Regions:
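C-terminal motif of bacterial Sec signal peptides marking the signal peptidase cleavage site
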Residues: 18-21
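N-terminal capping segment at the start of a domain
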Residues: 26-72, 83, 298-313
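A non-catalytic alpha/beta surface segment that caps or lines the substrate-entry region
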Residues: 51-114
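Bacterial N-terminal signal peptides that target proteins for export
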Residues: 2-11
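Second-shell loop/turn segments in exported
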Residues: 35-43, 58-67, 94-97, 139-151, ...
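Active-site-adjacent substrate-binding region
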Residues: 91-93, 101, 221, 228-332
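Solvent-exposed loop/turn segments at secondary-structure junctions
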Residues: 62-64, 94-95, 114-115, 125-129, ...
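Acidic/histidine-rich catalytic neighborhood of metal-dependent amide-processing enzymes
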Residues: 141-247, 272
Length: 332
């Protein structure tokens, strides 16, 4: 990255990401059918989600082939199991853009695994090996904690899983009657920048798109979460999401507004992202991307790919806005 543009002039290509200048302000969303909405019977805990971010960071940077990566992956899988979900790991060997051989691990946790009607929520759990967007060039080879970029999406999913367990155990709450999968992508954030660099990012989701964890897996749609835990964050209707899954985008953004989080979920079309949702969409599954943009700067969050992407810069209200919106979606 050589610099950032404001949101009115960016075309973001993220596989954790490249920003390219483009013209035009975010477009107002098209008028769409109103979504029926009933408030969810449960409350998403931003404190729990924050603690899950902190726990991931406590292992150290979750870079490929590292001990921290292995230990954190084991903890994520064990935590989903503790919340009563069926968990499996999808392993695969791959090479990074520089030829480094890596062992990937996509983690899939399933609520109501026997249900045929399913949706999924996803996010990547690895962290970037280099702080190559840090103002201090001497830190460009330093691995980052990935508290927001990676950790926040996984934390939201873990808290959603905990809430689903509460619903399943409570006689007075009608738990969702649909199967829900939480997919934790690996090897998203070790790509390189350049004109033909897109395929170097999102290796875990690229692999899964060709080798789904079950042969007959055909969810109604997916929702990918990326960088959903920093301050001054907003979410636009992302271009690829609108191309492949406009009804899902509409549903989520309307529910967010009805639940009181309209100031986070901006009712306008933003930039194009090449994130984990893209290989999923291209494989035939509608999937949307909820990815954070700094409200003031119109760029990725200011801690993006810097050593400051740590637990000190996680903002609980943003975790709450995204987490409660996802909970409302699951119960509606």
């Amino acid at each position: 990255m050589t610099g950032f543009k404001t949101i009115s002039r960016i075309c973001i290509v993220v596989m954790a990401a490249v920003l390219l200048a483009c013209t035009g302000k975010p477009k107002p969303a098209a008028v769409t059918t109103e979504v029926d909405y009933t408030p969810a019977p449960l409350t998403f805990s931003e404190d729990s989600a924050y603690n899950y971010v902190a726990k991931q960071c406590s292992f150290g940077p979750r870079t490929m082939n590292s001990q921290a990566h292995q230990l954190c992956g084991d903890w994520i899988a064990a935590t989903f199991k503790r919340f009563g979900l069926a968990v499996q790991s999808q392993y695969a060997d791959e090479r990074l853009h520089d030829g480094t051989k890596i062992r990937m691990r996509n983690i899939i946790a399933s609520y109501y695994p026997d249900a045929k009607k399913r949706i999924f929520i996803s996010g990547h759990w690895d962290s970037r090996p280099w702080a190559d967007n840090d103002d201090d060039e001497s830190k460009h080879q330093t691995p980052i904690d990935g508290a927001n970029d990676g950790g926040s999406g996984i934390a939201v999913m873990l808290e959603l899983a905990r809430q689903l367990q509460i619903a399943a155990l409570c006689d007075t709450i009608a738990a969702p009657a649909i199967g829900i999968d939480f997919i934790c992508w690996d090897a998203e954030d070790a790509g390189t920048h350049g004109r033909f660099s897109a395929s170097t990012w999102c290796l875990g989701s690229q692999y899964w798109a060709k080798h789904r964890h079950t042969d007959d897996y055909a969810p109604l749609y997916g929702i990918n979460l990326d960088m959903v835990g920093s301050a001054n964050t907003v979410f636009y209707r992302e271009v690829v999401s609108m191309q492949y899954a406009p009804t899902v985008v509409n549903r989520v953004w309307q529910i967010a507004r009805k639940a009181g989080y309209g100031k986070y979920f901006i009712d306008a079309e933003g930039a194009e992202m090449t994130d984990d949702h893209v290989p999923v969409c291209r494989s035939g599954i509608p999937c949307i991307d909820i990815i954070g943009i700094d409200e003031e700067q119109g760029t990725f969050p200011l801690t993006w790919h810097t050593i400051d992407d740590n637990i000190d810069n996680i903002f609980k209200p943003t975790l709450k806005a995204v987490g409660q919106t996802m909970l409302e979606v699951l119960f509606n």
